[in-house]
Amino acid sequence: MAVAGPAPGAGARPRLDLQFLQRFLQILKVLFPSWSSQNALMFLTLLCLTLLEQFVIYQVGLIPSQYYGVLGNKDLEGFKTLTFLAVMLIVLNSTLKSFDQFTCNLLYVSWRKDLTEHLHRLYFRGRAYYTLNVLRDDIDNPDQRISQDVERFCRQLSSMASKLIISPFTLVYYTYQCFQSTGWLGPVSIFGYFILGTVVNKTLMGPIVMKLVHQEKLEGDFRFKHMQIRVNAEPAAFYRAGHVEHMRTDRRLQRLLQTQRELMSKELWLYIGINTFDYLGSILSYVVIAIPIFSGVYGDLSPAELSTLVSKNAFVCIYLISCFTQLIDLSTTLSDVAGYTHRIGQLRETLLDMSLKSQDCEILGESEWGLDTPPGWPAAEPADTAFLLERVSISAPSSDKPLIKDLSLKISEGQSLLITGNTGTGKTSLLRVLGGLWTSTRGSVQMLTDFGPHGVLFLPQKPFFTDGTLREQVIYPLKEVYPDSGSADDERILRFLELAGLSNLVARTEGLDQQVDWNWYDVLSPGEMQRLSFARLFYLQPKYAVLDEATSALTEEVESELYRIGQQLGMTFISVGHRQSLEKFHSLVLKLCGGGRWELMRIKVE
């Protein structure tokens, strides 16, 4: 079986080129789906804010020339009026700049939400998450691209947004204006101003620190959720759990985004404080100079000399230099954005390509699990045969070495099959083909029943437990607890936990629906994890149970008891195992001998 082809554009070296532009434009279509979308309206709001902000900045820039007159003429009343006007303009400008930053942050959150959920839809469609993490090696760290790269891309892009959209206006205008225009008191005042600003900002920062720590925790939880899918992609794929994991991962995303919105609301007041003190500092020099001027210290200077003293920091030139400096500073940010664009764009192109191909070859869709039908309800069309294999040959991905050759097999209800053989002979590989995770290199594999409670259920070699309550572990991967079942469902779960030898687990978790803050893999032993998997199997009650060494950590006595209960519940087993004690629960044994050879024998009933 061949590994899936390389990612679109995988051979190209990421650069600031046409491919970058194409990928960037495709991402923009996700961020701005229409002119009337929320993101487009916020971006238009940002443009209006920056234009208004630049108008106010220009008015502030005219203040120095007016100061020249009042200071040169020693007009105290005029100075007071002008200073009041300047302070009002500075406060207005600081507020506008704060809302500018606030809007950029809201854009970041909204962009991240839309882009991440877009990638989630593609990633959890079918078994794309399994293919990317297990069968392909051309897309590195898809979880990092979705969680970290998207976050950094949106943050960097939002930090550039206001500067980029206003730069053409400011550069042209201030270039023209620049072309046309061609003691102890100071230190004490400056230090006092600095100390005051530090105290105010320290007060405003207090509520932010705790919220920021919580945000970083949720960021780690969100990354861990994707890591959990990556590490357990195969068990999740056997469970056909893409839909439920999609919901759970989006749920963690929503918690993170809600915390970020709360954090940014608190940061708004900090922005106002910081920016107000930043811009008030621009007139501090005038205030410092005004005191000695009106006290007669500079009485011997002419008006021209006073003007020279006051105009040391000419507004237009300084601001023009600042505009160019900002653009130069953005070059580093732009290179980062280009890198993230290529990584996200390549992942998106690969997922879209896989999605198009899977429409033709996918055996079953998300409805395959019957996720909205509780176990115990009648199936629509019961089937007597689960799998029909005709001259099937199997090889591992990226390998031509045959594991199984020309296998013909019919697995029917009541005819349990035991698969044995040494390590590396293809036992689990055969289950992967039955589960649709791999394709056979030759022959025909037909699955004549459904996945889920009324058809086939796989218990992978490595038990899989998602985040959630004890009830959610037992009913997994069903999405919801069915309200119509009520206490009857509770009784079934408790009974099956007891049959699996886990009645004490209810006390440890303080109930079926108590949220736990631990990782199930950290608190359960290997034997307990296998017992809990059987409790899940009993609850779902499939007609066919495919077990990949599902009792390897249990004693033969416990193994026999669990198999006996499964038989009483009407299950037909397809088991991979090594113990001879398993034979009494099966009708046939398929022995894989290596090199593609196999033997199919009927087990004699003694």
Swiss-Prot record:
**Which Gene Ontology terms of cellular component type are present?**
ATP-binding cassette (ABC) transporter complex; endoplasmic reticulum membrane; lysosomal membrane; membrane; peroxisomal membrane; peroxisome
Mutagenesis or variant effect for residue 432 to Q:
In MAHCJ; decreases interaction with LMBD1. Does not affect lysosomal subcellular location. Decreases ATPase activity
EC number(s) recorded for this UniProt protein: 7.6.2.8
Keyword ATP-binding listed = yes
Instruction: Tell me the outcome of changing residue 427 to L.
Output: Decreases interaction with LMBD1. Decreases colocalization with LMBD1. Decreases cobalamin transport activity. Reduces synthesis of adenosylcobalamin and methylcobalamin
Database matches in CDD domains? ABCD_peroxisomal_ALDP
What does this chain do?
Lysosomal membrane protein that transports cobalamin (Vitamin B12) from the lysosomal lumen to the cytosol in an ATP-dependent manner. Targeted by LMBRD1 lysosomal chaperone from the endoplasmic reticulum to the lysosomal membrane. Then forms a complex with lysosomal chaperone LMBRD1 and cytosolic MMACHC to transport cobalamin across the lysosomal membrane.
Q: Supply the name of the protein.
A: Lysosomal cobalamin transporter ABCD4
Identify the species of origin: Homo sapiens (Human)
Underlying gene: ABCD4
